[in-house]
Every structure is written in structure tokens, then in C-alpha cells.
């Protein structure tokens, strides 16, 4: 929706959408006009950097934003997930399936070494059987996910397992984005009762 909204602000044909490295390699400045780029604020920082490198190499005169246009919350969360995922048996991103930020965070966790990473958009899909066999679990959320969803997820785990929460701070900000590592062991309580 963000890209569609931006493209709709200008006359048809005045903006070209480049969605991946292959499209960046094939892009043609048909009319030889001055060109510039902007990026969707919730894209993967790493993926965006590669596309930008390709465009800059092909079009040295290309204009770019005066400052980083990836949302700082997105950048910081991706950096935190990247840093922590390699230590985890499982990684959960709490967020919506239609949130590109949340979906990208799952991709970042997988690329960073935690293959068993997944998006949790509903209590009904929490994989408790897999969690009970894990020692270290990473948790983060999409930028627009309310903190209460993360708290509810952790509460659900506490009801089934004995856990230790270790909040990891990667970057000091005025706005806090908590990333948790959970150390699990089976809870003596009946998970149903």
C-alpha cells in the first residue's frame, strides 16, 4: 500500500517500480531523463542496499535522498534481529501477515542463521511442541505491532513453560524496542488447566 500510494501521487509513467536486484540490473532509463530513487521505509535494509548499489553503478548520476529513508524503527529492529538470530533455536516475529516490516523481519532472522523463524499473527498458530524442544527463543515484533501482542505471547509461554527472559539492547534509542531471548524448560503445570 505504501508504494501504491506514493506512485499514485504523480502522473502515470513518471515512477518506475523496481522490486528486486534483477529488476535493478535490467532497468532502462528509456528517455535519458534525470533519475532519482526512494525506498519503501519498511524494506529489508540489506536487500535495499544491494539494489541501490546496482543502480548507482549503472547510473552514476542517479540522485538519492538526503538522508536514510528506511524507517529507523525498521533499521534498528532488523539490526537487532540479525544480531540475535544466530544465537537462537527458534525466532518469532509478532505481527500481521500483511505487514511488510514483519515479513521482512522473519526473512532477516532466517538469513542470519535461525532457519526456524516464523511470523506469529494469531495465538492459534503458536507451535508449543517445537518450543518445548528449544533452549533459546528470540522474539521481536513488526514496527506497527502493539506491545500488548508481544506481552500476550510471552504470557502464553509462561503459562506452559518455565522461562527466563533476557532483554537484549542493541541500540540505545528514545523509543524502546524490546527483543527477548527466552530460555525454556517444560513447566510442571498442566498447559490446559
What are the language-model segments listed below?
Residues 183-193:
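Single conserved hydrophobic/aromatic residue that forms the stacking wall/gate
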Residues 1-141, 147-148, 152-185:
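The feature marks the mature, well-folded catalytic cores of soluble enzymes
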Amino acid at each position: 500500500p505504501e508504494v501504491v500510494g506514493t506512485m499514485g501521487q504523480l502522473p502515470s509513467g513518471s515512477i518506475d517500480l523496481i522490486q528486486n536486484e534483477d529488476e535493478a540490473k535490467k532497468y532502462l532509463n528509456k528517455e535519458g531523463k534525470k533519475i532519482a530513487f526512494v525506498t519503501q521505509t519498511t524494506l529489508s535494509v540489506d536487500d535495499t542496499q544491494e539494489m541501490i548499489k546496482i543502480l548507482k553503478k549503472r547510473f552514476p548520476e542517479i540522485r538519492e535522498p538526503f538522508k536514510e529513508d528506511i524507517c529507523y524503527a525498521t533499521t534498528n529492529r532488523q539490526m537487532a534481529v540479525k544480531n540475535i538470530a544466530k544465537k537462537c533455536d527458534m525466532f518469532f516475529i509478532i505481527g500481521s501477515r500483511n505487514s511488510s516490516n514483519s515479513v521482512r523481519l522473519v526473512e532477516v532472522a532466517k538469513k542470519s542463521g535461525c532457519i526456524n523463524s516464523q511470523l506469529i499473527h494469531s495465538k492459534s498458530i503458536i507451535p508449543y511442541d517445537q518450543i518445548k524442544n528449544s533452549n533459546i527463543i528470540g522474539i521481536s515484533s513488526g514496527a506497527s505491532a502493539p506491545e500488548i501482542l508481544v506481552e500476550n505471547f510471552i504470557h502464553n509461554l509462561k503459562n506452559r513453560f518455565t522461562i527466563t527472559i533476557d532483554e537484549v539492547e542493541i541500540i540505545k534509542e528514545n523509543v524502546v524496542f524490546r527483543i527477548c531471548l527466552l530460555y525454556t524448560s517444560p513447566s510442571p503445570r498442566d498447559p490446559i488447566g
